[in-house]
From Swiss-Prot:
Chain residues that bind Mg(2+): 71, 139
Organism: Rickettsia bellii (strain RML369-C)
GO biological process, one term: pyrimidine nucleobase biosynthetic process
Molecular functions per Gene Ontology: ATP binding; CTP synthase activity; glutaminase activity; identical protein binding; metal ion binding
Stated name of the protein: CTP synthase
Binding site for UTP: 13, 186-191, 222
Length: 540
């Protein structure tokens, strides 16, 4: 019998519902249960694929090509269970399906309403594709009281009534703000949040209280009294220095055991060895290595969430603290680049879209190459590395990408360039995914290359999100100038990896390795990149 756990939030957004859901799922997994995590987002976009990173943060790509919320990255990193298109839904996707069904006449002339038609689609999403799982954890985006979230709260309220307590549990995450002048945590916002949740028919079974310091027993008892919850089910969520400390903190407070007790399930011992190993490695990470990220959205770190985490994972692997140096690519010039990158041990250019800030990134590639600083280019980062090499090593001074320029030598071209049915005027928000290469694809690596040696195998599968590729017409001239093409798609039409073997570590990949990195299984390319940065640090 599958059991459903709904995680909601109140008081403020960005409290850590995703981390709480991921941590609990991992803890249940450690007790031998099979878990599934899902995110329900109340915004009207069909998916986050075309949303501005300033608005949404990173778009997390799954194996099956779904463009999803960044919280699914947390889910995968904590549990190791691959997410899929069935694990994320938005209000936009709900209404898109609803209107399609209505136009097809599938509602047989009924008045289509939020209740029951919208809520039924949400319920169907939650209850479908659950075979083989012991627990399905659903995170509801936003906070209680948000008008756009009401259909989702109504849907889970109905599920709670239909399944009863034997199959359904509600966890509510709130904030206990600390008022310095009063020198105490304030419980009133939590009381009001629970009250708001109850007005829509949901009574939380477990209350998780986020705070910046330890919560006193008297404060827990006060919260329990006014929120009508047993003190045993009021769980502290104290700020941690590292997100990978969160699961064991919840375990210490007994969150996993309280959930099993609620469902009247046997409380088995937890197998948490690999998480204890992570904690020990973090404690032993005294030395530092500095990695510069040449970013377009340097002020919004969530736009590069998986890259940040993948670097952290490599640091955990090597028992090194990875200090990130954020560089605004728009402000990089020939005159200031040496000052901006002074003292860094590695340079990373992440993926992205749009022309803005690309020339600054190209300058950073040049600085890494000419100073033999370890370099890692991902997706657009690889393409810009190819342009830098073309301009300054191969001699093609007018090298450009077709994505931004119509004039010049097009080192980077559109994947669909040779598709007979392709028409540039057809690229709209509605059909833009038709030109995008999304999801996992097999890559064949070249033996005795940096990339192949990192993986330890010649056939790999990695996730992609791009519509442009290296122009294979220039492969020969690049090779004559020392470039090694170390990875190709199965049909050999798409270059998947390039490298400069004579340098300490210079690798560009078309795919997104960061999406597959985990704290207990760091991605091999990030392991080798950070390893090269450590070596550079020791020698300079």
């Amino acid at each position: 019998m599958v059991r459903f756990i709904f995680i909601t939030g109140g008081v403020v957004s960005s409290l850590g519902k995703g981390l709480t859901a991921a941590s609990l799922a991992m803890l249940l997994q450690a007790k031998g249960f099979k878990v599934c995590l899902r995110k329900l987002d109340p915004y009207l976009n069909v998916d986050p694929g075309t949303m501005n990173p300033h608005q949404h943060g990173e778009v997390y790509v799954t194996d099956d090509g779904a463009e999803t919320d960044l919280d699914l990255g947390h889910y995968e990193r904590f549990t190791g269970v691959p997410a899929c298109k069935f694990d994320n839904i938005t209000t936009g996707a709900v209404y898109s399906k609803l209107l399609k069904e209505e136009r097809l006449g599938n509602y047989t002339g009924l008045t289509v309403q939020v209740i029951p038609h919208v809520t039924n689609i949400i319920k169907d999403f939650i209850l479908s594709n659950t075979k083989g799982f012991d627990f399905v954890l659903c995170e509801i985006g936003g906070t209680v009281g948000d008008i756009e979230g009401l259909p989702f709260f109504e849907a889970i309220r109905q599920i709670g009534n239909e399944l009863k307590s034997k199959q359904c549990l509600f966890i509510h995450l709130t904030l206990l703000p600390y008022v310095k002048t009063a020198r105490e945590l304030k419980t009133k916002p939590t009381q009001h949040s629970v009250k708001e949740l109850r007005t829509i028919g949901i009574s939380p079974n477990i209350l998780v209280c986020r705070a910046e310091r330890k919560i006193a027993k008297s404060e827990i008892e006060k919260i329990a009294l006014f929120c009508n919850i047993d003190p045993e089910y009021v769980i502290p969520a104290i700020d941690q220095k590292n997100i990978y400390l969160v699961p064991l903190a919840y375990h210490d407070y007994g969150l996993d055991n309280k959930v099993l007790k609620f469902f009247n399930l046997t409380i088995a011992p937890s197998k948490l060895n690999r998480w204890h190993d992570i904690i020990e490695r973090l404690k032993e990470s005294h030395s530092k290595v500095r990695i510069a990220i040449i970013a377009k959205y340097h002020k919004l770190k969530d736009a590069y969430k998986s890259v940040i985490e993948a670097l952290d994972h490599a640091g955990i692997y090597h028992k090194y603290k990875v200090d990130l140096v954020w560089i605004n690519a728009e402000n990089v010039t020939n005159e200031n680049i040496s000052k901006k990158l002074l003292g860094v041990d590695g340079i990373l250019v992440p993926g992205g879209f749009g022309e803005r800030a690309t020339e600054g990134k190209i300058l950073a590639v040049n600085y890494a190459r000419t100073n033999n600083i370890p370099f890692f280019g991902i997706c657009l980062g690889m393409q810009l590395a190819a342009i830098e090499i073309a301009r300054n090593l191969v001699g093609l001074k007018d090298a450009v990408t077709e994505e931004f320029k119509t004039a010049g030598t097009k080192i980077i071209e559109r994947i669909s360039k040779h598709d007979e049915d392709f028409n540039p005027s057809d690229i709209t928000i509605e059909n833009i995914k038709k030109t995008m290469r999304l999801g996992s694809y097999t890559c064949n690596l070249v033996s005795d290359s940096i990339t192949a040696n990192a993986y330890g195998e010649l056939k790999i599968s990695e996730r992609h999100r791009h519509r442009y590729k290296f122009n294979n017409d220039f492969q020969d001239i690049f090779e004559k100038n020392g470039v090694k093409f170390s990875g190709f798609s199965e049909d050999k039409k798409i270059v998947e990896a390039i490298e400069l073997p004579k340098l300490l570590w210079f690798v560009g990949v078309q795919f997104h390795p960061e999406f597959k990195s985990k704290p207990f299984e760091a991605h091999p390319l990030f392991i080798r990149f950070v390893e090269a940065a450590i070596k550079y640090n020791k020698n300079n």
